[in-house]
Amino acid sequence: MAVLIMVALVVAVMLGLVIGPVSIAATRILGDAFSHLGIGHSTLTSTQSSIVWQLRAPRMVLGLLAGSMLAVAGGTYQGVFRNPLADPYLLGVAAGAGLGATLAIVDVANAATVPTWTPLLAFVGAMLAVTLTWVIGGRSMRSTAATLVLAGVAVSALFTSAQTFLQQRSSVQSIANVYIWLLGSLANASWHSVLVVIPYVVVCALVCVLAGRALDVMSVGDDEARSLGLSVRSVRLVVVVASSLGTAAVVSVVGLIGFVGIIVPHIVRLLVGTSYRRILPLSVLFGAAFLVLADTVARTVMAPSELPLGVVTAVIGAPVFVVILSVRRMGHS
């Protein structure tokens, strides 16, 4: 199964580089890549080379990073909270990032500085929301997963109401810009944004994957896990910090992209079973492939215009999620 997912990932990467308003053959792209290593000669024009390496490649890499982080964070949350409906935005990341981005677009930045301020304040807002959630619902030694989730719901409601207030006092153009950001997109991807996000994703995703064994133990219940010698609160803190930090970094750059973190772990679970030691690493690969394919659809189905990436993931994700729930219901009946 891991091999099949790897093949799907390679296919997604090639499609992301090949398909677009200007189609470029995969063999020519590979030839150009080898020519940069001093092997052979490129058959691409300078314009085609720029399209591939300055536009499509950073977009594809950012899609790989975002998809892998959202998927593994969703799987981790589903494990640590023992909630199959958990996603990476459970503890207020989406609401906090939305408030930060709205503040940047409406009040702080001008047209020239929006690309700088929006991801910065979105990241700060996301981490502030998660921190507040933990302070309210997670710092007590007696705190449970349910307490933390309820705190996340309350914090999300607070931040969302503040975001709505900001939007009500802003211009029509600012509201439109906020709306575009909230739907998510890789259109502004660059090598700079890739370099900003990659350390967060690599470290945080690795922590989540390594927590798989502990999540398997916690799946039997907190009390049982403690009786087996596991520090449940410490594991929960580390996992929540890693998942939230990685998600905040991704969301600050690409906006809010739904369904990746909830459906990918479910699909992987159907394929490989219920052990998080297998679910989490495969979710990294599957999530990366899924988001790159979704972005390819988003930028080509209405070319030269683009669909918001969040719309594409919702159109794909909602029916898939219904099918998954039906399969699980049939399995339990």
Report each predicted region and the residues it spans.
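Alpha-helical transmembrane segments in inner-membrane proteins
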Residues: 1-333
